Amino acid sequence: MKNTSLIALFCAVLMVVPTTARSEAVATSADPRATAAGAEILAKGGSAADAAMAMMLALTVVEPQSSGIGGGGFLVHFDAKDGELSTINGRETAPATARPDRFMGLDGKPMPFVQAWQGGHSAGVPGNIRLLADAHRNWGRLKWAELFKPAIRLAGKGFVVNKTLESRLEGVARFWPNFDAARSIYWIDGKPAKAGDVIRNPALATTLKTIARKGPDAFYKGAIANQIVDAVTTSKVSPGDMTLADLAAYKAVEQNAVCAPYRVYVICGMAPPSSGATTVLQILGTIEQFDLKALGKDDAKSWHLIGQAMQLAYADREAYLADPAFVDVPVEGLLDRSYIAERSAMIDPMKARADYPAGNPPGAKPRTAAISGERYGTTHFAAVDANGNIANMTSTIESVFGNQVVAGGFFLNNELTDFTFAPEKDGAPVANRVEPGKRPLSSMAPTVVFDRDGKAILALGSAGGKRIIMHVTKTLIGVLDFGLPLKEAIGLPNIFFGSGALLVEENTPLAQKIDALAAFGQPVKPGDLGSKVNAVQLVDGKWIGAADPRSEGTAMAVDGKRRLRLIDGGTIEGSAPSASVH
């Protein structure tokens, strides 16, 4: 599907260049086993979309805390032959019986998050399998069943628990007495599995084999659908109301990409209900008047300016962005150049402002801002095939291990907690409130960058909940403004704004400049702002890949002779297994 969003702007700035040149193929993800699955598919002659699909399925097995077939995601795809940029929205939907007060307590106040998070009532109808099916129909090269083989192998034969999974299992252990199915897979001898243990998941292997053999409908109808509905409605904690009809009715949505110029580039991403592209592009547009290249990455002023632009854009995000099937979302107004200039003029280069109101973009109806929350159970992966096609996808089950409910060996999401809990503010309906069939607002931001000649040169995304937007923005600035190598740009310090202060990633060079940042007139605090960025970049005519140094991710290349080569990150095999096998 051709990109037609902001079409006048897009055509004025960029003519996308088709290319048929062959080069090394690249896959990157947050887990080496998933990266290897993508590279395996590329080595078999698979397309970028095929490789992304294999990575998503493998991540269901080896990174169950972050994503999987029980969740949803967003895919941005670039077809190098005809220059088409397409996106698929696989965001979860609220059940047909969902109501705006779903997460309101009996006292009329929003529930505490921990009460809303766990159990069947927070589960949205999963979208990932439909997304993958649409992508495979449009751009797949290998057979559907072939793409499941690496994940089936990992689930059936077992995989080694890494430090990240060990840590996440320890973090939720106190909740799992209520979640028998989760314990049966991930606990050994009555305790959470440790790094070096081997986990086998035969139930998930069976589920994957069924979908591989019967196709995507096997997930949304029949035995697997029955398992999902049963797990949701009989959950010991907060049972939900998802039905077989909800699953059968689910459809992924092909949308127009959202694109805008930044300096000599054009940057594109997902339309709402993803807030990623709109907010990233607002931030970049707002700081474009400032010469970040001259200031450099080591000047506190650069980060002051980026932080102020972030606050302006997030104020608009909370007021205007939601599912466009339910709410008029003024994307073009939010990215209008005159409006961006008006917002940018509010920034004082020498003095921070603690709070910015939402603006009044062209074409927007007055809207009440309301804060929505997002947790960090998310992952990103990307692939470029030998023909230069790009598949760039962010996938999530929302919180760590989703809602903790397991069906068919996989975790279900708690995506409905991405809706704003309080449906009204000051007597007016909130844009991102719960409604039947609605898709909650997301910060997932799979992003593709084109150069001045219209050539795709960079694709990236990240995990991190509401911070995803800043992780992606920071990396873009690192590459496009500071001129850093991709890995170094990903490794730049993360910042965010929360609890009335500018938060700076602890144990980074920027954390040593807190006094300099505070001199601009706002509180600054160190914080744990870890990220999981994965990206591919065209450098001197050759695609490279990189994974966040904070993660256990990797990137692999496949050459013209279909030989695999690790180009970033650690070993593919992971830690040697201990004697404990589950």
Can you name each region flagged by the protein language model?
Residues 67, 72-79, 379-383, 446-448, ...:
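Short beta-strand scaffold segments in enzyme catalytic cores
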Residues 22-36, 40, 46-49, 53-214, ...:
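Noncatalytic scaffold domains of N-terminal-nucleophile
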Residues 437-439, 472, 481-528:
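Extended C-terminal subregions enriched in glycine
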Residues 7-17:
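Bacterial N-terminal signal peptides
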Residues 289-396, 523, 548:
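Internal maturation/activation junctions in enzymes
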Residues 254, 375-378, 442-444:
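Short, small/polar residue-rich loop motifs at catalytic or cofactor-binding pockets
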Residues 61-65, 72-78, 82-87, 238-243, ...:
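Active-site rim segments in enzyme catalytic domains, especially the processed small/beta chain
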